[in-house]
Amino acid sequence: MGINLLPIEMDEIRKRLGREPNETEWRVIDAVWSEHCSYKSSKIFLKSFSIDSPNVIMGIKDWQDAGAVDIGDGWAVVIKVESHNHPSAIDPFNGAATGVGGIIRDIISKGAKPIALMDMIRVGNLKIKKNVWLLKNIIAGIAAYGNSIGVPVVGGELSFDDTYNDNPLVDVAAIGIVRKDKIKPSIVDKAGLKLVLAGLTGVDGLGGASFASRKLSGEDEIGAVQIADPFAGKIILDVTLEIADKVEAIKDLGGGGLAVAVTEITNGLGATVDIEKIPLRVKNMNPSDVIISETQERMLYAVEEKNVKEVCEAFEEYEYPCSVIGEITNEPVIKFRYIGKDLVSLPTNVLLNPPRFLWPIKNTKKNVEEKIVDLPLESAIYTVLTHPDLVSKGWAYSQFDYEVNTSTVVKPGDADSAVVSLPNGKLLAIKADANPDMCAEDGYECGKGIVAEAYRNLATVGARGMVAVDHLQFGDPKKAEVYYTFVEAIRGIGEATRFFNIPIVGGKVSFYNENNQGRPIKPTPLIVMAGLVQDKLLKNRVEDNLYVVSVGYTRKELGGSLLSKIFKIPSQAPKVRLQEDLLSSEVVIDSINEGKITFAKDVSRGGLAASLFSILVHGYGVEISTKSILSDTDNVIENLFSESSGRFIVLTNEPEWIVEKSKSKGIVASIIGRVNKKTNILTIDNIDYNLKNIVDNYFNFLEEVMGNG
């Protein structure tokens, strides 16, 4: 049957039902109980993310298709993150494109208008031609769908590691806007509502939820990958927003198809669906396939009978299929019928309550023996600053229509955060962060660290974080070392979000990111955070003679850093001191609001050296003294490449003001250098390093590699 359930789960089903399910019922159970849809190995831990916040309209406790927060003036922001990792490994164009389509439908299922997308892409070594092919097609798929549907891609991440050679990670986040009294649920609260399906059902995506809930085998069928149709997606978007007032609930058809959507929308009630009423793309489809097909560009609506005609007429204007396929019932049973015969008859509470698993854990933390770092500075500078993680991502952004709808305020790559304008005149900053190298060293500190980094990134444009979603991407949870890091990352994320009082209103868990030899990816939890610009927006500007001020304390912490990864330097992972992240961020926000700085960048990937390099790519030079860096080490390499948390560099004409402001907040800051007109020259302790080749590499690397791949 191709069922992905464990023997213990199959025995549990037989016990609960008191009978043997038929083949179609097994396929339904396999979809609804899949890890992808049920969170059976993670849900118990995800509950710890819940924060009671007056701004939360729809949060993690509601378990809906997207989260929503109040932003004032009667408006709400809707936010969601998803991935399409396994499909993108098989068919990168359609895998990535359907990832965009799915996240858009999650946003409109709340009645919200999508206003921004972010893409977070991780692929393997670009010296391998397959990875070049994957990246080309992933970016092309995202661009094709986002550009066609009219939602701008405003930012994201693009990074590279051998761990992703067989398992690219393709994450997409979306932001939507809606009047808060117009938000739609994804579940019903009464029987008698008609189930209306928009869109054609085909044979693509069969078993997709189950496919996403196991490791890649090397023998996976292309049929498990859905096919994207952005023009149909645009119709779904426009009509859904048009008819939102006429429907009671909206549910995207994603993983598990109708099997999952119908089960989840009932909210514990029941439903009866007549399969022969479902519009088909392929004639004479197997009724069982119809139930679990994951054909894209479909939506399910729960509608009062009196409004059904008006809802379907809206789709008919676009010649888009719309049909009443069933109804919500009081009897808590999910029934799929074909020409009067029940093919599926399963209790709702059985489907909605899969077994929960707590797998064994194994502490994989290692006691690292610190060694004196003895590297030639020039070699460290050249090797770290030419790493693909740090080069310009302009090659990717140039393929996106990031200014469509004219809401984009800060262009992709121009700052540490994307910024979009909202209907109430406010500005919303958005950022995504992950740190798999740090997570491989310490899941707990990594969990705290990615939240803190996202918070700092928002601060660099003058925004304060207010809401987040997470995506937790790991290997097989049944492996004790994988599950341990997963649990530790959740502990760190939860601690940090509670500290910053930032509610996580939704997210996703993606397990089984392994190759066919069973090698898992590095643990890759991801945070997407959004927040309102508090007063003034900072658009980075570099000028001659500005002072370089380092805000925050540098520590001898190279573990998980880019330097330690490249040169294999054993070191402890940084300890994330959340109070320092908060206070240094407040210094930066205050400095922006007072008009005291022209440029701000957090210190993270690549350390202080990478942050200084971001000034050089503006066409200037920088001179610094490492003796002026406030730190616990005299080692120049450690000062320049440590990735300690809680730090920024800012450019200012009033450096003493920044130092005093920092002191008033309980944070250290020091004047470490000055900007000059010596283009491409980084002067460190009176020694000039000509970085022209590195600057050229920064702008040209991806275009050259992707053009030659």
UniProtKB/Swiss-Prot annotation:
Disulfide bonds: none
Subcellular location: Cytoplasm
Pathway connected to this protein: Purine metabolism; IMP biosynthesis via de novo pathway; 5-amino-1-(5-phospho-D-ribosyl)imidazole from N(2)-formyl-N(1)-(5-phospho-D-ribosyl)glycinamide: step 1/2
Catalytic activity: N(2)-formyl-N(1)-(5-phospho-beta-D-ribosyl)glycinamide + L-glutamine + ATP + H2O = 2-formamido-N(1)-(5-O-phospho-beta-D-ribosyl)acetamidine + L-glutamate + ADP + phosphate + H(+)
Primary subcellular site in the record, as a coarse category: cytoplasm
UniProt keyword annotations, A-Z: ATP-binding, Cytoplasm, Ligase, Magnesium, Metal-binding, Nucleotide-binding, Purine biosynthesis
GO biological process, one term: purine nucleotide biosynthetic process
Entry annotation: catalytic residues: H36, H84 (proton acceptor)
Residues annotated as binding Mg(2+) 1: E82
Molecular-function annotations in GO: ATP binding; magnesium ion binding; phosphoribosylformylglycinamidine synthase activity
Organism domain of life: Archaea
Cellular component GO terms, alphabetical: cytoplasm
Residues that, per the record, bind Mg(2+) 2: D106, D252
EC number: 6.3.5.3
Binding residues annotated for substrate, in chain numbering: S83, H84, N85, H86, R105, Q226, E294, T295, Q296, S510
InterPro entries recorded: PRibForGlyAmidine_synth_PurL (IPR010074), PurL_linker (IPR041609), PurM-like_C_dom (IPR010918), PurM-like_C_sf (IPR036676), PurM-like_N (IPR016188), PurM-like_N_sf (IPR036921)
Residues where ATP binds: Y39, K80, D470, G507
Function: Part of the phosphoribosylformylglycinamidine synthase complex involved in the purines biosynthetic pathway. Catalyzes the ATP-dependent conversion of formylglycinamide ribonucleotide (FGAR) and glutamine to yield formylglycinamidine ribonucleotide (FGAM) and glutamate. The FGAM synthase complex is composed of three subunits. PurQ produces an ammonia molecule by converting glutamine to glutamate. PurL transfers the ammonia molecule to FGAR to form FGAM in an ATP-dependent manner.
Record note on quaternary structure: Monomer. Part of the FGAM synthase complex composed of 1 PurL, 1 PurQ and 2 PurS subunits.
Protein name: Phosphoribosylformylglycinamidine synthase subunit PurL
Species for this entry: Saccharolobus solfataricus (strain ATCC 35092 / DSM 1617 / JCM 11322 / P2) (Sulfolobus solfataricus)
Gene behind this protein: purL
